[in-house]
Amino acid sequence: MSYVYFRLPHSTHVFRNRLSTEPEEIASLAELNGRRGFVIAPFTTSDDCPILLLPTDWEEVNLNFSGDNQNGEQTHLSSNDGVSAMLLDADYEKERQRYAVDFHNYHGQLTNDAFQKIVLARSARLTATEKLSPLTLFARACHRYPRMFVALFSTERSGTWLIATPETLISGTDGAMQTMALAGTMRLSGANLDFDVEGGSIGKDDIHWSTKNIKEQRYVETYITECVEQFSDDVNVEGPFTVRAGDLVHLRSDIRFHLKDTAHLGNLINALHPTPAVCGMPKDATRDFIINNESGERNYYSGFSGLLDPNGDTRLFVTLRCMQIEGEGEATAYRLYAGGGLLKDSQCQAEWEETEAKMNTMRQLFKHI
């Protein structure tokens, strides 16, 4: 049975939809104009990774609910089952070698001025010493990451994915919309672990952003603002400021605007996605390069998901911190994804460490709370 669970940022309400049929497949983002539903979109649409549109037949569930459903299937939605697991990565050295080759290839394009910025992604396929159900991992993500959009979905076409992401693609109600330019990454440590306010002052004086991070975020902000201005005459940019996502912080600008015509919401989404935060600049050239040169397939990583309603509430989020859950029982594996924006002055070791830090968002879920 296909299903989706989700919880919005800064909310305690969890909703689910268990589908009796497979979701509708959409050929292009522009075809989302005038449509309503829960959208699951890949980095780039293909026969293997279509855009999926699910109906909005939601029921609210208790995060601590545990039991059997009416079909006798076990339904477990508790974050406190007392189980911790060690994650094993048998291919770690091979992954590092592949990443180094990709980095050299990507960085060469930057030094030759082919691109201003490009995002290099990788994945790691892990096994665990204990098996944790997708619902347990979802519940733990809700508990650990209250600021993030958390979703768990499973369909025949997409497979099973768990997402905990800090980045909004677009949100709003009745045409009053907001998006964000999120880029730049630093790991919190020491006293900075107390940093707990979006745009606030706790630890602010101790968080110093490098020129590379500031430049990367500015690229993203400029691109997204220019996209939005095609669909709105009223655009307001606030930021950048520092926000927390797990044990990481990012630079973020908020971009608020009024959509001229809500019937063209799909066109706006098509213009925004993929943003420079997951792709690069210029958009089309870097996307084509990624598709043809990246060692692994991104699939639904760096796509987006969430609620779509042109005449109501829209809440779409970029699929950043995520894992794909493959197989069942003893054969279960967890494929974690992460990426980072490369500029001319990027260094391979630092970028590898950034992807490791981002993957820790998912790794932490295997530890008992």
Where would I find each of the regions flagged by the language model?
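Cofactor- and metal-binding active-site motifs of prokaryotic enzymes
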Residues: 1-99, 133-137, 151-169, 175, ...
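An anion-binding catalytic pocket shared by soluble metabolic enzymes
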Residues: 2-11, 127-215, 219, 312-339
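A short glycine-rich, hydrophobically flanked beta-strand micro-motif that places a catalytic Asp/Glu
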Residues: 40, 118, 150-154, 298-306
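Conserved hydrophobic/aromatic pocket- or pore-lining residues that grip, position, or stack substrates
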Residues: 113, 170, 222
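Short, surface-exposed recognition loops or helix-turn segments adjacent to catalytic cores
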Residues: 119-124, 154, 240-242
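Conserved hydrophobic core element of enzyme catalytic domains
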Residues: 255-369
